Amino acid sequence: MLLLLAEYLQQFHKGFAVFQYLSLRGILGVLTALVLSLWMGPWLIRTLQLRQIGQAVRTDGPQSHLSKSGTPTMGGALILSAIGISTLLWADLANRYVWVVLAVTLLFGAIGWVDDYRKVIEKNSRGLPSRWKYFWQSVFGLGAAIFLYMTAQTPVETTLILPLLKNIEIPLGIGFVILTYFVIVGSSNAVNLTDGLDGLAIMPTVMVGGGLGIFCYLSGNVNFAEYLLIPYIPGSGELIVFCGALIGAGLGFLWFNTYPAQVFMGDVGALALGAALGTIAVIVRQEVVLFIMGGVFVMETLSVMIQVASFKLTGKRVFRMAPIHHHFELKGWPEPRVIVRFWIITVILVLVGLATLKLR
């Protein structure tokens, strides 16, 4: 929106051409979303408290979590609002990738909103029935996958890229739709499973979003892409604005979500942010790198899958409780220790993911 204004004002003063730089608009995206989050946060928390929109806590979980009952939830609406406003202000609105990622983020956020709302109304932690949650996730995930497949302009946009392996590209054809579906829906649910402790999900999301933002910037520049042997995806660089907005909104939300949390993001935030990360990774053809950088999300998801499979097959549990962050809590780790150690793991994994740029 403001980019269009800057382009118009260039005819009066050449200084407005500075807004053509992606790096500047990415930074402005961070700052705008951060300020919006910090500004709207207190108002949102007060509103949620007045309307008694509080978190319902599982009674079979760690006893320390019982004190969290009633903490305002659905704070993800703050994150999505800041991301949306900042992106619309600073991104090129003629870019199809910007609209795809925004649409996926808001649609998955809508699923989470309904889920959170039902939890609040029914005063339990079940929310929207799983079959309906997965149904709508599948509808929106497949919709995004089909759109990206149908609008692909070059073969590389539907090709599987394997990091660390030079010049190895696997054309996916219609398989691109299937892979994209699983990446988007899987990422959405993985972040949601991770969102069980104060600040546990949002900081890794910010870190992974920052890492993917770097890939977006590089993939959108033909010179960088050729030098680093990564796919050149015209227009993908514009997603650095969205990633910047995600970083700013996430950090602003963390101000209120850090231990002990004043507000939880709820499914409205977790489902949306996970889907956004998955969609961005698909666009820049870095699904494998997302798997690496989002290792904490993968670990949380696998712990649930292993726990369920083990109990159904043998009647025994592998972990004291799943997702795995609860396992460590029940082992006696204080909540802040679990959170910070998972953050440290994410820092390392994001650096490993970025290292694949040179290890080819």
Curated annotation (Swiss-Prot):
It is an enzyme of class 2 (transferase). It is found in: Cell inner membrane. Keywords: Cell cycle, Cell division, Cell inner membrane, Cell membrane, Cell shape, Cell wall biogenesis/degradation, Magnesium, Membrane, Metal-binding, Peptidoglycan synthesis, Transferase, Transmembrane, Transmembrane helix. The chain crosses the membrane at residues 25-45, 74-94, 97-117, 132-152, 168-188, 199-219, 236-256, 263-283, 288-308, 338-358. Its cofactor is Mg(2+). GO terms for cellular component: plasma membrane. It comes from the Bacteria. GO terms for biological process: cell division; cell wall organization; peptidoglycan biosynthetic process; regulation of cell shape. The keyword Ribosomal protein does not apply. Pathway: Cell wall biogenesis; peptidoglycan biosynthesis. It is a multi-pass membrane protein. PROSITE patterns: MRAY_1, MRAY_2. One of its GO terms (molecular function) is metal ion binding. Its EC number is 2.7.8.13. CDD domains: GT_MraY (cd06852). It catalyses: UDP-N-acetyl-alpha-D-muramoyl-L-alanyl-gamma-D-glutamyl-meso-2,6-diaminopimeloyl-D-alanyl-D-alanine + di-trans,octa-cis-undecaprenyl phosphate = di-trans,octa-cis-undecaprenyl diphospho-N-acetyl-alpha-D-muramoyl-L-alanyl-D-glutamyl-meso-2,6-diaminopimeloyl-D-alanyl-D-alanine + UMP. Belongs to the glycosyltransferase 4 family. MraY subfamily. Catalyzes the initial step of the lipid cycle reactions in the biosynthesis of the cell wall peptidoglycan: transfers peptidoglycan precursor phospho-MurNAc-pentapeptide from UDP-MurNAc-pentapeptide onto the lipid carrier undecaprenyl phosphate, yielding undecaprenyl-pyrophosphoryl-MurNAc-pentapeptide, known as lipid I. This is Phospho-N-acetylmuramoyl-pentapeptide-transferase. It comes from Stutzerimonas stutzeri (strain A1501) (Pseudomonas stutzeri).
